[in-house]
UniProtKB/Swiss-Prot annotation:
GO molecular function: calcium ion binding
Family matches, as Gene3D superfamilies: Metal Binding Protein, Guanine Nucleotide Exchange Factor, Chain A (2.170.150.10)
Function: Involved in protein synthesis. Involved in microtubule stabilization.
Family: Belongs to the TCTP family.
Descriptive protein name: Translationally-controlled tumor protein homolog
Start and end residues of each TCTP domain: 1-167
Organism, scientific name: Cryptococcus neoformans var. neoformans serotype D (strain JEC21 / ATCC MYA-565) (Filobasidiella neoformans)
Transmembrane segments: none
Keyword terms, alphabetized: Cytoplasm, Cytoskeleton, Microtubule, Protein biosynthesis
One GO CC annotation: microtubule
GO-annotated biological processes: translation
Compartments (UniProt record): Cytoplasm, Cytoskeleton
Amino acid sequence: MLIYQDVLTGDEMISDAFPIKEIGDIAYEVDCANIIIKEGDVDIGGNPSAEEAAEALEEGAQQVNNVVHSFRLQSTSFDKKSYLTYLKGYMKAIKSKLQESNPDRVAAFEKGAQDFAKKIVANFKDYEFYIGESMNPDGMVCLLNYREDGVTPYFTMWKDGLKEIKI
C-alpha cells in the first residue's frame, strides 16, 4: 500500500486505496465518495454502495467525504485573491524542494503548474478547500470538486507536493 504525504508538512493526504488518476504530469485526481458514519463505526477503507447515500441518516450518524474522514483533512476557505497569494508561496516552496531532490523536474513543474493554475482560477467558484490534519498553512491545499454529474466528488492534489511512502 502507498500513502502519499505532503512534502512540506508530512501530513498524510491520500493512499492508493482510492482511485488515483494522474492529470498532465502535474496533478492527481482522487475519486472519493460521501459515506455515512455512525458513532463508534470504524472505517476500514471499504467502498460503500452508491445507494447507501440515499438512505435517511440515523440518529448519531453523519454524512462525510471518505477521503476527508480517513485522512482527517480540515476544511478551509479562500477568496480568489488569497488563494492566488497562497499558491504563489506554495509553488515557490515546492520548486525549492524539487531543486534539492529532483532538479531535472523543475522546468516541467514550472510549466505544468502555471498551466494548471490557470484552470483552477478559471473554475475557482467550483472548489472546496481542504488542508492536512496538522492545519499547517504552508502545506498543500487540496481542491474538492464534483464530476459533471454534480454528485460524484473528487480531489485534485499537486503531484510534486506529495511523496510516496510504501507501507
